[in-house]
Structure formats: C-alpha cells, structure tokens
Amino acid sequence: MAAPFAFEHRAEFLPESSDDLLRSIPAAPGVFALRGADPAAEPYLTRAADLRRRLRRLLAPPEALDENGQPVPSKRLNLRARIHWIEWTRTGSDFESTLLLYRAARSAFGPDEARRRLRLHAPYVLRITMSQPHPRVYSTNRLSKKSLRESFGPFPSRATAERYCDAVLDLFLLRRCYEDLEPYPEHPGCVYGEMNKCMQPCKEGNPQACTPEQYAREAQRVFDFFLTRGQSLLDEVAAQRDAASEAMDFEAAAALHKQWEKVRAASLQADELVRPIDQLRALILQEAAPLEDETRPEAAAVFLFQHGHLCGPQRLSTLGVRAVREQTAVGSSLFAQPLMLAPIPLNEPAPIQIAQNNPVILSEGPERAGRVEGPQPKNPEGPPTTQTAPSFLATTPEDRARAAIDALAMHTESAPDMAEFCDHLSLLRRWYYRPEKQRAGEVFLPTPDGAWPIRRILNGAARVALGPPAPISPADREAAKALKTRIIHAGREGVEREVPLLPKRPRTRKAVTPDDLV
C-alpha cells in the first residue's frame, strides 16, 4: 500500500501575521491546500504556477471598505476568515504538479472524486481476444486484469485507435464482426468475406471457409504484429521479396516491395508508446524543484511508469554530465568543444546517514526528505524504508542513473487496483500526447532487450536540468564599418586598400627623454 499523503510544508495561518507567512512561501509552481479549523472538513485544493501570488489573492485582506470600516462584498473568492492551516509543496514542472494534485485529491476526497476533479478517463486501447475461439480486434477503454496481456496502447483517442486497427486488419484476414460466432456451413457471412478480406470462420464446415487451426494461426500473426509493432510482418514480407529477387522474378519482387511499404505505413500509424499494456514501461524526465540552498537546479526529476504505477519524483544529479550535454549539442570535436577540456567535479557530497527512527522514502532522496515538515514525506508510491539510498553512494553518472531507476522500481512491485491503474495510465497518456511544443520534459522507453538506455537518459537529464547550450553570438560584421579607416598605398593599382585605425593607447606617464637620464 502507498504511504499516506502529506505535503512538504504546513503552517498555521493567522490574519495578523499573514504578510510574513505569505512572504515565506516561494513564488514558484506547486500544489497547496487550505484547511479550516475542523480537520474533518474538505480542504480547498488546487495547483498554481505561482504559489505566493495565488495565496495572496485568496488570503489578502479586502481592498475596499465602507464608511463603517467593514469590507465591501466582492465577487472575488476570499478565504481569509475561514482558513486556519496552509499546506503546500513546491514542484518543478507541470507534470509533477498534476501528479501531486492527483495524489492529494485522492487522499482528501477519495479516488472517485479525484478522478472527477481531474477529468481522468481510461485511455483507448486495442484488444485482440486471443482467449476466445474466434479472436477479433476492437477498440475499448474498459480494462481488466484478464485483458491486460491482450491489450495494446494507449492511444490518444478512439478515432486514432480505430484508424490503426483498420490499417492493420487490411493486412490480414481476421474477422471484423462483433457477434459471438456460432459457426455452421450455411452461415450467410458478411461483406468482408465476399471481398476476400476475411477467412469466414462463421462458415466452419463449408469448403470455402477456413479450419479452426488456420484461423488460430492467422490470429497469432496479428497478435505478433501488435507485439512487435509490425516488425514480424515486415521481416516476413522482406524475406519473400528477397527470395523472389534471387529467383529472378522481379515482378513478384516489385509487388512484394509495395506490400512491404504498405505494412510499413500501417506500422507507423502507432506511436512509440503503443506497447502491450501489461509490459508498458516509460521513464519521464522533468525539471526538478530546486532545493532551499540551491540557486540553480543541477538535477532532473525522474518519474517511472511500470506495472501500472506512476511513481516519483526521484532526483538525478547532473554532476559530471556537463560534457555529455555539450557533446550532444554540437558534436565531440575538441575544437568545437573547448569546455570538454575543463575539469569537472566527479565527487558528490557525503551521503546523509538516516537514523532508524527517521524513515525516508528512496523515491524522494535525502535532499527533499530533509525539507519535509511533518511525520510523513510527500506521497511516494511505496512503503517507507530506513535504509540509505544507494543512489547517493554512487560516484559515476551511470551508477546514479541506475540507482535512481532501481529506487523507483522498488515501489512498482505490487500491482495496483484497476481503477488506479487506469488513472496513472490516463495521466501518462495526457502528458505524452500533448503537442511537442507544449510537452515539457523527455520520455524514454526500454530497448527491445528490456534494458534502459542509460547514456541517452543522462543526456536527456542534462538537457532538462541545464537547458540547451547557449547559442554562439553571431559575428558583428557591421561593427568594423564604424571604425576610423585609412587608405594606404593610395593611387597604386592592385595595392591600394582601406584598413581600420586602431585606437591610440592612453599615455599613463610622461615620456622620458635622453636628457632626463643624464
């Protein structure tokens, strides 16, 4: 079970000292809750791009007073007279704010109300019913534990899922009808059977129909297509094309090449995130919220989606990764990269020893844990532990990245209930399918062998935390025109030219003549 949620900071609100309290709240993005004196009452919970500005608007004294000194009623919401406690947590990105708001709403109002407030809906997926006698493919947004291994997604919308489904089914002879088949030889069939786009399993026993074994093999080919994102059929058609080319049957090879291009176009309609739902894993990098003693953030926030859990953030330090960031920008040439010759500190600060009576969540790290005010840290997805985080004992960037991923993976071992699974999947889908210019951060998927691309993750962390390299200032070619010039070798053809005059050096002391030395 997940640990109880708690904000990082909690302060008592007193109207007479509200100015000092509001000045102590950072003018940065975050999530906050306003509570009254009754602990059982529902809080005012929301997120803000500027915590201090939003709280001033809600808790500032009224600006207009009548002749008796009483505040004039205003349409603006003001909770100054109702609030007793303020709780807040600073975040580093919009993605972290959304995830934190979901956890806070789930803890305060329950899962159903949190889902309604954040407008979370299960994303659409494609399911191929391999457990049925006559499998078919259809789009749905109803997930169950039984259907996870047969579902592929998520897709941004139902229309996108159905468009991809139609493109894939055009490559195979799987049925498209939705009825529960009871085959018999005199079955009327459908229009797809008449167009030779279906194997007609409904006419079992008819010479024109297929056998159950043939239909099962065709269904397995479709399942392999979804599983490999089209690579299985691409390899099959490419092998047939090469065989036809070697046999000098160039017409057949050309037709197979067109078929290969059609398969390729169909496979590209699915985004890279479309995977088997039960095997979906994604690592998201966002800008981390700076620590209290940091003037400039030097770490990225890591989030992990695995086994239906979306956990994080885990801070990943970019110490020693500056050269990697510069190399990804303009190449590995030392002529173009003079900063790569500069020394880079490779030692991290001494690890913080955690006492047995002060538990810390590994997904938060000791830096953020030191800022927690209260008995519980900000809700990580997993039980608390008392061991020191291994990521802060690592010395190389690769070791720190692996340790951060392992720390997050510890909280994804137990499968969540399907409602929470769908909520986390919806949060991932909502962020991933944003327009590229509006989607802050980077996402990484595992390699085909299941390993994480550590080097690419470090490059992405450097880009997220340090920002893109500053562009080289362009040469000002017009500046030379403003300088005083002089023509030398005037009148000599081919030799005459105009050169700028350098400014004279200011005289610092009186000139010394030979007579002064006698």
Located regions from the model:
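Conserved catalytic/ligand-binding micro-motifs in nucleotide and anionic cofactor chemistry
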Residues: M1-A247, E251-I361, N379, T385-V518
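A cross-taxon signal for low-complexity, glycine/charged-rich
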Residues: G365-E367, R371-K378, G382
